[in-house]
């Protein structure tokens, strides 16, 4: 029976630094501290960190000399976690909201649908306007196109149509992007 590879969580990926004695295979490091930047032996850097009751954290292992900092690792992890949560909060996922209308829509119903579309566009979401035909209404697809173009025109100050409306079988569809 084979063992499953472990799944790393988001926090594990964020904190992939080697700390103190876990930094191996290094004889000299570029040490960043309050005193400035210096190239010292690994043992000396570790000794300085222990004297200050702090941790020696490997920040970058990409260069010839590994870059290490003398910091409080617990506090550093907390700050990184806080920054990542703050960045995640600021992200906005764009959703596509759908507004369904009919070719013979009453004016009040049309205004309500338009108001909802404006709210969605104001929140930064895309709006998919779909007009559905029933039965013999398909014979008058030009009426449906007029309603859809009217909706696009009325929402012009809130968003722009991705492309011209497309008739797809028994419906006309257009997607409006927020400004």
From Swiss-Prot:
Keywords: Cytoplasm, Initiation factor, Protein biosynthesis. InterPro entries: T_IF-3_C_sf, T_IF-3_N_sf, Translation_initiation_fac3_CS, Translation_initiation_fac_3, Translation_initiation_fac_3_C, Translation_initiation_fac_3_N. This is Translation initiation factor IF-3. GO terms for molecular function: ribosome binding; translation initiation factor activity. IF-3 binds to the 30S ribosomal subunit and shifts the equilibrium between 70S ribosomes and their 50S and 30S subunits in favor of the free subunits, thus enhancing the availability of 30S subunits on which protein synthesis initiation begins. PROSITE patterns: IF3. GO terms for biological process: ribosome disassembly. It is found in: Cytoplasm. It comes from Leptospira interrogans serogroup Icterohaemorrhagiae serovar copenhageni (strain Fiocruz L1-130). GO terms for cellular component: cytosol; membrane. The keyword Transmembrane helix does not apply. Its main location: cytoplasm. Pfam families: IF3_C, IF3_N. Monomer. Belongs to the IF-3 family. HAMAP family: IF_3.
